[in-house]
Amino acid sequence: MAYYYPEPSHTFSEYLLVPGYTSEECIPDKVSLKTPLVKFRKGQEEPAISLNIPLTSAVMQSVSNDTLAIALAKEGGISFIFGSQSIESQAAMVAKVKHHKAGFVTSASNLTPENTLADVLALKAKNGFSTVAITHDGTANGKLLGIVSSRDYRVSRMEPTDKVSSFMTPREKLVTAPAETTLKEANDIIWENKLNSLPIVDENDHLLYFVFRKDYSSHKANPLELLDSQKRYLVGAGINTRDYETRIPALLEAGVDVLVIDSSEGYTCWQKKTIEWVRKTYGDTVKIGAGNVVDRDGFRFLAEAGADFVKVGIGGGSICITRETKGIGRGQATALIEVAAARDQYFQENGVYVPICSDGGIVHDYHMTLALAMGADFLMLGRYFARFDEGPTPKIMVNGAYMKEYWGEGSNRARNWQRYDLGGATKLSFEEGVDSYVTYAGPLHDNVEASLYKVRSTMCNVGVTNIPDLQRDAKLTLVSSVSIVEGGYHDVTLRSSNPVK
């Protein structure tokens, strides 16, 4: 006989946080939102990767491209570049993020003295970088012979056939720094010499990296930005359970920091096989998350398979209709609470903490705080990020209001059957997502800043200043439908919508 859960499953809007004691030290500016992204052992000082804010962007065509990945990394979160595209184009997006940043940057634009002005212009048009390294062999780590920047040429007064050697700034006129130079020292050299870029070279004068003035300004404006050991932005990527043996190597070559198996249902043999292949091929050096699941059995299955984090949620996304078309899923709050308990039990038994990601069901900003209090280490958001300037879809006018297009990976538009296919030879013939619009909301920075201020403020109401304390000390109450109505405005007439004449 089928098992019946004794209680209905619930979602975030059915819960409220009960205030706790707020001390003088508990103010929003002192709240830390740092949280682990990947698993770690008890007693280990730091996970291999942590987030500075508990936000990640969904593995979706209409959400996570390289532009949004850069913007979110500046805030301290991470994007997972969508996998429903060719291996080459996904790897190219990852590479753009890794080359964009900051600190010590491997040169992405390189030529030889024998190249021409036309080559310089073509390279600039291709990758958007205005600084070109001139090396003996035209590679990023060749012997440095000069630099070409936009100040070195005027298209209107030169011929496309002019050789680079005739207008580049030669090596003897360049200020450089040795390999052991720290980022602070490099920035000091840049400011003292009024430079826009500083080449870092080895003992044989081969180019190693550039340090750019603009990146110093960016870091000062974004103190929580998420960087790797080379001061490049962190970026993730979604994979499927079919072409992973060719997709993963290409993504790693492009510099990806973390992977996630993108699937509507993660409690499957195919996810286990994918994780096992990663562990056999790369050991623990490659970080890979898995999901989605909605109960303790699904979590333990993926944790024991070797997942670095586990995503929680089926059918709760605003564009997801998996529950409607297939009748599977669970209320997001109930699923999250159960999986969080399973994660804590697994940690007690094995000494390994496997972070969980709440994926779906976030409608209002306060839902973020509820999800974290219920045990989520971080959140994955689709609709939320799809509204911003940096997202991949255009801003359009619909019925007098600016909107952005937003569609699910299970929709006909995405046709990402590898995400929803259970592994058989026959492709699915129905949709599990819709094609829609979301209200345009402006730049990512302004919106994330406002949302996280609400999270920090609410945490202070609870009486905590970090996420682990929130998960330990928060008190939550299930509310009735009448209480939900009571929580909004009621028994009044709004002046803005019903002006008094």
Question: Which residues does each PLM region occupy?
Answer:
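Catalytic cores of alpha/beta
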Residues: T67-I70, Y244-A254, I288, V293-V312, ...
